[in-house]
Structures are given as C-alpha cells and as structure tokens.
C-alpha cells in the first residue's frame, strides 16, 4: 500500500517493521538495510538499545544511505520534492527525467540498463506510488530532528555493525564512510567498493553477497577488531 493522505515518518515506518516482526513471530535475526531503510534501521537500533525493540538483533549491516544529515548530499530533485513545489513536481516527472536522475547516482561502469530503469519505474508507479514521493521526502527533516539519537545508537551499539558502501555514490559514498569513522561509530566490518555508486546491491550484487556472508562469518570469530573486506 502507498497511501497518499498520511504523513510518512521514520518512526512510523519503524513501527510497521516491528509490527511485521511481531506478526511473523521472529525472535532473533540479522538486519540488512539500504538508503531510506538505513534511517529506519537507525531508529530501530535505538529501540533495541533501549530494550524496547521487537525481537533481538544479531547484527546490523548498512548499505549506502544518509546516516548523517551533515554528509547527506541530497539531489536537487529531492530538495524540490521536499518543498511546497513537491506535489507539482510529481505530476511533471516522467520516465526520461527519472532515468537521468536515477542513473546519476550509479557508478560510471555500472549504469542501469533501460530494462532495469523500466522495472524500477514500474515499481515506483505501482499503486500510484509516484504521487507520494513528496510525502516520503520528510525523512530529510526527520534525520535533522533525530540526529543525536540515531548517531548515538551507532556509537553505543552493543550489536555488531557492518558497512558495505559504494564509494562513488555522490549522495552517501566515501565521504559518508569517512564521517562514520570520525564519529567513532561501531564498525565490525567495512567493505568499500571503489567503482560502485548508491545501489551496490544492484550494481555489484555478487560482491555485496560475498561481503555480507563474510561479515556474518566474522561474527563467529568475535575477534573484536574491524574486518576489512
């Protein structure tokens, strides 16, 4: 469902995830997140550390995403969607403009094919989803408002954390990883993919799979040192 009338908040999305965990009866599990999902995962991680989260996390892995508002380099389109012009921009945005914007955050050698762009466009438009984009952009404000809570959760995490990052992502690439390290956030496994952009799971799925499996395997050794992929 993609309701058009509601306000999309990160806390609301976190509530939905926890409701699903409860419905599925999940007791313990690993979490892998990307992009908007990274921010939802930050709120969920904070709840885990408070002892208020649903289920028990065994680990958390962040792919590319705006973990820190000060390093998130939003595209012009995202900024416009967040503005009062957002609802009108939704109407004007077609496949060609989407394709240009979407492709701009991929690596030079891993641009999406036209078929992949069509598939993503179909997913966006399913259930009239394109017309809620401006509502979903409020996550940018949420990141500013709750920065201290969410950054503290990563710094104080008692749960193993991995970062698998496409370095040439203009939105949240190598500069985000540098900030992550500078703030001494928990980091048990790091993989930096030098030619990959914002969507590593699409651009380099095999590399991401191998790194994620390596991270999970490293949890068994529990060496206490950062493992670099």
Predicted regions and their residues:
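Conserved alpha/beta-hydrolase catalytic His-Asp/Glu region
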Residues: 68-71, 93-155
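Catalytic active-site module of serine/aspartate enzymes centered on a nucleophile-bearing elbow/loop
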Residues: 186-229
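Conserved catalytic-core motifs of eukaryotic protein kinase domains, centered on the activation segment
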Residues: 1-6, 71-74, 174-175
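Generic structural signal for small/hydrophobic residues in well-ordered secondary structure
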Residues: 17, 21, 31-35, 120, ...
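Conserved hydrolase catalytic core segment
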Residues: 23-72
């Amino acid at each position: 469902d993609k309701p058009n009338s509601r306000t999309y908040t990160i806390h609301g999305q976190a509530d939905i995830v926890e409701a699903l965990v409860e419905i599925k009866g999940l007791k313990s599990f690993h979490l892998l997140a990307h992009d908007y999902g990274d921010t939802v995962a930050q709120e969920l991680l904070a709840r885990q550390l408070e002892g208020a989260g649903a289920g028990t996390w065994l680990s958390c892995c962040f792919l590319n995403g705006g973990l820190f508002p000060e390093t998130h380099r939003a595209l012009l389109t995202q900024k416009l969607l967040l503005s009062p012009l957002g609802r009108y921009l939704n109407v004007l945005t077609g496949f060609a403009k989407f394709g240009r914007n979407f492709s701009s955050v991929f690596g030079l050698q891993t641009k999406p094919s036209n078929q992949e762009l069509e598939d993503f466009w179909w997913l966006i438009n399913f259930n009239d989803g394109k017309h809620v984009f401006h509502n979903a952009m409020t996550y940018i404000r949420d990141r500013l408002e709750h920065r201290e809570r969410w950054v503290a959760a990563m710094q104080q995490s008692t749960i193993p954390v991995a970062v698998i990052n496409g370095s040439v992502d203009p939105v949240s690439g190598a500069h985000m990883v540098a900030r992550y390290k500078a703030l001494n956030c928990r980091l048990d496994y790091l993989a930096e993919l030098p030619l990959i952009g914002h969507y590593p799971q699409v651009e380099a799925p095999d590399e991401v799979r191998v790194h994620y499996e390596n991270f999970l395997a490293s949890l068994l050794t529990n060496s206490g040192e950062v493992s670099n992929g």
